[in-house]
Amino acid sequence: MTRRHVVVMLTTSYPRFPGDTIGTFMEPIAKGLAARGHAVHVVLPWHPRLARGPVEDGVHFHPFRYAPHPDLNVFGYAASLRADTHLRGAAYMAAPLALAASWRAVRRVAAAVGATLLHGHWIIPSGAVVAAAAGHLPVVVSLHGSDVYVAERHALARLAAQAAARRLDWLTACSDDLRDRMIALGADADRAVTIPYGVDARRFRPDAVLRAEGRRAIGAGPDELVLFTAGRFVRKKGFEYLIDAIGRLAPRWPALRLVIGGGGDLDAELRARTGERGVADRVSFPGVLAQDAVAAHLAGADIAVMPSVHDDAGNVDGLPNTVMEALASATPLVATRVGGIPSVIEHDRTGWLVGERDAHALETAIEALLADPGARARLGSAARADVLGRRTWDAVAEAFEQVYDRAAGRAERRRQTD
């Protein structure tokens, strides 16, 4: 029988309002734990667009302010890094203020609600903060991607991550890659576990009505073949390689179209690249899509593609949300063999995996599926079945629940020996 935990989560990203695309995986983790009977309190930075009530679906929200000037509201919500590779100048000024404010907020909320456990999302900065604020409370830290990258490349961040790793009771990662990299930095392998993200299989589903809605939104005719991808326009998404692949495919597939949902620092560059490759009329950019719109676009697509890469600085996605959403939608998926992607895709059964930074490999895989509707149906059906069997958000919440119990048990043993 699991314990009932009073959890204070510290995070730098969370959907700021219903339908927001920032930190989308955080909401189902928090809501899933609350639905299983735990008291969940989320401490998060204030943001001008933050529109959360005090309690929603059993999750309590505690925003903290840190910026004396609006220009310094760059802590969290994917605002600290430029193209996910370099810290913005304002982030250097905001970070000390935000770290101090988040530490005070965690201590205040934990005392007020009688916390039994602290959970930091991203080891830098939240993991380091909860480790410093915990006292005797058990600490769980979750790795999501850019945190490990920052720790690997910046000495002060590395020292903070290593200090947090020594203090925490249990570590989770959304991919084996992140877990192994943090172990290489000093985390205890015996207290580190991989918990891949889940997906809302009710929202993301194969459905004729949803497919028709998506095709209308795309403006696709009945005979057109649609590829879909989505994400922030940053280097590690690898969208430029997909555009190059479309440039190669377009002459042979006149009915082929590509839709790239999202936005970000590379918007103008990606649009320009479509012109350079002669496919500006084949590639559309609908902007940042709400979750329901992503579901419709995936249902309306013939193939989903996630061309993630290690960027030039070495940063890589932990596990892109679009991968899980495509699998649940039964949309056949071509993805690169990087980060956490291989941990959720079995090649030639639930999707196709190719090497990164390889437009020719993307071209070959996409063309093979375009030419074989039977293979597309087979991959999509197997992917959907795999999601329903073990990759729902409830399964993820149960896995975190088990980690909480282990962390609490270890903290009790530690207190007995202190």
Spell out what each predicted region is.
Residues M1-Y66, E412, D418:
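N-terminal subdomain of nucleotide-sugar transferases
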Residues V323, A328, P332-A335, I345:
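Short hydrophobic beta-strand element within catalytic cores of glycosyltransferases
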Residues G221-K237, I243-I246:
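Conserved donor-binding/catalytic core segment of Leloir-type glycosyltransferases
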Residues W46, D177, G198:
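Carbohydrate-associated surface elements
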Residues V344-D348, W352-A359, A368-G374, G389:
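Conserved acidic donor-binding segment of nucleotide-sugar-dependent glycosyltransferases
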Residues R271-A293:
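Nucleotide-activated donor-binding/catalytic signature segment of Leloir-type glycosyltransferases, i.e.
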Residues R282, A299-V316, T331:
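Acidic donor-binding loop of glycosyltransferase active sites
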Residues A361, A368, A375-R390, A399-Q402:
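A short, well-ordered alpha-helix in the C-terminal region of glycosyltransferases
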